[in-house]
Amino acid sequence: MLKFIIFALTVALCEAGPANNVVRPCRLDDLKCIRDNISANSNCNANVRGSIPSEYVIPRFNFETPFFNASYIDNNLIIRNNDACRVSEFFFNVKADTSVLAVDCPNLDLESDRTLIQHASLQEETTYNYHIRGIYPLIRLTTNLLNADRLNLCNAFTYADVTALPIFKIDPKDRPTANFLSRDLSLLNIYERETFAYRPPQLIRQFVNSLICDFGCQ
């Protein structure tokens, strides 16, 4: 059975009205209230470290861009400003048995030595290498947690909205890479959408497991 922290629920119900199935039990800046409500409806560990490093490194991060027939490897991916993320929405839909948690991440900074593997039919793959750093004005992560009385971040889907294109700097490591990389940015929005089909689980888990409740998945 879905459980709420009663003192917060009373306020939320007054705001929502009796006919509304959506319950917002917490202020968005009240991580303790969010933690209490999530931990009451899951098996997560509420004893979290309470902070995110301003900068941390992932040794290897793989992603694909099917539209461009390419695979990518971010080597020594440096992530900055994940600690600046803030909760932008949190509610339970009682009728749908679902909880929604959204997090806004301003100025998300990603830097890596990237390997690009270009695929083509009936041909060998071609590999290119470059250093890249991109700063995203705002990435909005929205996670739908099904079975609201048995919440599990580890198997939940997180959608990333790239609200604005990044400011980035690219340093090709050789002449073939420099010649290959396009200066035409007209398809950058498609590229970023495909890229951020892969990044959300790591970003939301870092935030939730560090600040709200630890589900034990990386």
From Swiss-Prot:
Indicate which residues are glycosylated according to the record. Answer: 37, 69
Q: What's the superkingdom here? A: Eukaryota
Q: Which UniProt keywords apply?
A: Disulfide bond, Glycoprotein, Secreted, Signal, Silk protein
**What Pfam families does UniProt report for this protein, alphabetically?**
Fibroin_P25
State how it assembles. Answer: Silk fibroin elementary unit consists in a disulfide-linked heavy and light chain and a p25 glycoprotein in molar ratios of 6:6:1. This results in a complex of approximately 2.3 MDa.
Task: Show which residues constitute the signal peptide.
Answer: 1-16
Q: Name one GO molecular function term.
A: structural molecule activity
Q: Which GO terms describe its cellular component?
A: extracellular region
Which organism does this record belong to?
Answer: Galleria mellonella
Q: In which tissues is it expressed?
A: Produced exclusively in the posterior (PSG) section of silk glands, which are essentially modified salivary glands.
> Where does the record say this protein resides?
Secreted
- Record's comment on post-translational modification: Found in 2 differentially glycosylated forms (29 kDa and 30 kDa).
Q: What is the designated name of this protein?
A: Fibrohexamerin
